[in-house]
Amino acid sequence: MSQQTTIRKLAELVNTPVDKLLVQLAEAGMKFSGPDQVVTSTEKMKLLGFLRRTHGKAETSAEAASEAAKKITLNRRKLQEVTVNAGRTKTTVNVEVRQKRTYVKSENEGGGRAAPMTPDEERADILRKLEESRQRNLEEQQRLAESDRVRDEAIQRKREEEQAAKDRAEAERKAAEEAAAAASAPAPVADAPKPSAAAPAARLPSSPSSAPRAARPAGASPASRPAAPARADDRSNAAKHKTRGSHVMVAGVEDDDATKRFAGQLHLSAADRARRSNVRGKPTGRPGSSSSRRGNDSGRGGSQANSGPHGFERPTAPVVREVAIGETITVADLAQKLALKGGDVVKALFKMGVMATITQSIDHDTAALVTEELGHKAVRADNADFEDALLAHAEDAQGEATSRPPVVTIMGHVDHGKTSLLDYIRRTKIASGEAGGITQHIGAYHVETGRGVISFLDTPGHAAFTSMRARGAKITDIVVLVVAADDGVMPQTKEAVAHAKAAGVPLIVAVNKIDKTGADPLRVKNELLAENVVAEEFGGDTQFIEVSAKLGTGVDTLLDAISLQAEVLELKAVAEGRASGTVIESSLDKGRGPVATVLVQQGALKRGDYLVCGIQYGRVRALFDETGHQPASAGPSIPVQVLGLSGVPEAGDDFVVVDDERLAKDVAQQRETKRRESRLVASATNRMEDILAQMGKGEGQQVLNLVIKADVQGSVEALKQSLVALSNEDIRINVIHSGVGGITESDANSAAASKATIIGFNVRADASARKIVESNGIDLRYFSIIYDVIDQVKQVASGLLGVEIREEIIGIAQVRDVFRSSKFGAVAGCMVIEGVVKRSKPIRVLRDSVVVFEGELESLRRFKENVDEVRNGTECGIGVKAYNDVKAGDQIECFERIEVARTL
């Protein structure tokens, strides 16, 4: 190669485009203006060295050794943990990351370079390298072409095999339909063909390594199957692409039926279900059936159900369940009845806006709504098994009904003489023994008169005892409404009329206190006309009897009216058998335990009977009447006190006598469970509402916690209703605990934990409770009159409200002129036109009746002297602090802020 080699000539020799060669020369640090310039041998060697360095190769063997000495390679290994999904679970896999990095020593730091090659050696070396590069490119192109050809052939072969599999599946389906039709046709037993000798040969062995099926549908020739090499290739492809689910290999043989099963056919025809059960079941030997085929489920270790009426079939339509739901049900139990996960039911409740946990109880309405939301049907469950048993007992007690005494309830306003009238009838002094002279619980008595036995219920007249009066009207036969002739109709009088009408019982009006000078019975009749109570003399049907409980005037006439009304009603009841009735009042007596005052309405109550009373039960240990005697039994319309119950029953609960203690205990426990669940559901439902309400109210609302203990259940109920009703948006009365009986140690601990006030109504605290009260500084208060309880709780609640700041205007001054002062700035010359202006009070500046400034007085002078106040009709000078825009005609309003105690 001559020294006059141009760039164009060199490009032809190395088979490289001229432009590319110019770029490479430029990258090697040699600048040429055109392809006709001459390239020297030194420049060629420099280009070759650049290209070798670019491709990571040494220029010569000596250079290679030198390059190796200039390089250092560092290997780094790093262990990591990667979490991958494996079905429903997650698996942690250890991964090792290897990094390799090579560092090359700079050329400036190296030694001298090797001797340059001769031009002939350089040319031969370049040609050899170019030839090797062309050979490698050619081999790579051939390899890619061969790979494309093999891939195309595999795709084509796969399509042909899939088409052949579809054809075979269609033929098998038709054969299965024909076999199912033949099997469904009735045939005599005598005509059943025997299995032929060739039948076993047609069946496939049960071994997994057996050959493919021998039995093939008509029309499927052996030529349609692929060749053995294609099978091998197909198996390799299936192994590589098994995630696609195109083919399934069983014991080294392609299983088309398995492929079809994994394709996910959910809705199957009758023929498909018959064919599938035949494939999975054992051979039956019936000619024409496809049961001779191999079952592919042996690998899972369990045998499948045989075809027939008892075989399992996948449901093809949504299953709608009928779920029985009681009054309450837990989320877990509801999910079990719906055959769902508990989390799914909780999610459905969240979507409906109900925040519940899987163990929480929900009411029937909520459970029914979520059941309908999930696509099922909810029905109300009948949980009254024990209640039905009680009804059966009550029906067994039915016998011949005989006349019974009337039950008369005395109702009316407070201090109208109800108890005094009853005292005169009974010839006792009950009213004198009442605290404050007012009745605070229902009293039950029966009186033997010349006209027969009459049972009386004395109800409280105070507004707090509304529920007591309603309970008395519910169990009564006749209501005697006592109205004071000198006082007329009062609020509780109207309420008693409403209770009597709601209960549907006749009303007799006793106009009391007619012996007083201001008595006006006609006024009472006219006022009751507004309540639709019309006297007989006005054309109505209500008897008005004028009586005097003090003198006894008209009492006999009243008893005659009661007896007449009872005869009209024809009151009857069964006097024998198991007793039933209603609890009028209950209490907890020291030494006697729970005591319940009951009114027998059916049957006869005897000592030793097993009693169920609400959620309480027990055996009757003793019976007491209102005089303290112990009768042997109590018949209909007779009130008695019962001892022996397991706890204090609620006033108004019904009681019934049962045969044995076991039934009584079961019924009481079931009622208690239902009541507790209902209470939990109510508290859980209101919990979030209370939280949101507290968030909305913030810190503005005060809370007064109370612990209430009383002598009887009715008083507890009345106190709770009256005190909770005092709550408003500023203060909330919260009764954290209430009960019947004395104040115990647990009551004191509850009050100490919640910083509550203990209210004892006709009860006292024991020694241990008093010790806790003293050590913790608990507020303990005793009461015997309900008026005092309400008044004192109002005072305590008002003290929690704090004080209210009010502004009161004390004086107004009219600005007549404005003066300038070097010390105070603008000084207003004013005339006090109203009240008094004081220096220490805040002021407002009004302009055209609009407040333009609010601040305080800086200076108040009269005749250049500082004064504390200026009264009406006096001139003065007023300096307003930090305000210099006072103008003539403005008004300066002086006011003071006062604190006013807030009340309920």
UniProtKB/Swiss-Prot annotation:
GO molecular-function term, one example from the UniProt record: GTP binding
Region (G3): 458-461
An annotated GO cellular component: cytosol
Main location group: cytoplasm
Keywords: Cytoplasm, GTP-binding, Initiation factor, Nucleotide-binding, Protein biosynthesis
Ranges of compositional bias, category Low complexity: 178-230
Pfam families: EF-G_D2, GTP_EFTU, GTP_EFTU_D2, IF-2, IF2_assoc, IF2_N
Residue ranges of the region described as G1: 412-419
Annotated segments matching region G5: 548-550
Gene3D superfamilies per the UniProt record, alphabetical: P-loop containing nucleotide triphosphate hydrolases (3.40.50.300), Putative DNA-binding domain, N-terminal subdomain of bacterial translation initiation factor IF2 (3.30.56.50), Translation factors (2.40.30.10), Translation initiation factor IF- 2, domain 3 (3.40.50.10050)
Signal peptide: none
UniProt-annotated stretches for the region Disordered: 102-122, 134-252, 267-316
Domain tr-type G: 403-572
Location(s), subcellular: Cytoplasm
Superkingdom to which the source organism belongs: Bacteria
InterPro entries with a match to the protein in the record: DNA-bd_dom_put_sf (IPR009061), EF-G-like_DII (IPR053905), EFTu-like_2 (IPR004161), IF2_assoc_dom_bac (IPR013575), IF2_II (IPR044145), IF2_N (IPR006847), P-loop_NTPase (IPR027417), Small_GTP-bd (IPR005225)
Annotated spans, G4: 512-515
Annotated stretches, region: G2: 437-441
Binding site for GTP: 412-419, 458-462, 512-515
Biased composition (Basic and acidic residues): 134-177
Described function: One of the essential components for the initiation of protein synthesis. Protects formylmethionyl-tRNA from spontaneous hydrolysis and promotes its binding to the 30S ribosomal subunits. Also involved in the hydrolysis of GTP during the formation of the 70S ribosomal complex.
The family this protein is said to belong to: Belongs to the TRAFAC class translation factor GTPase superfamily. Classic translation factor GTPase family. IF-2 subfamily.
Record protein name field: Translation initiation factor IF-2
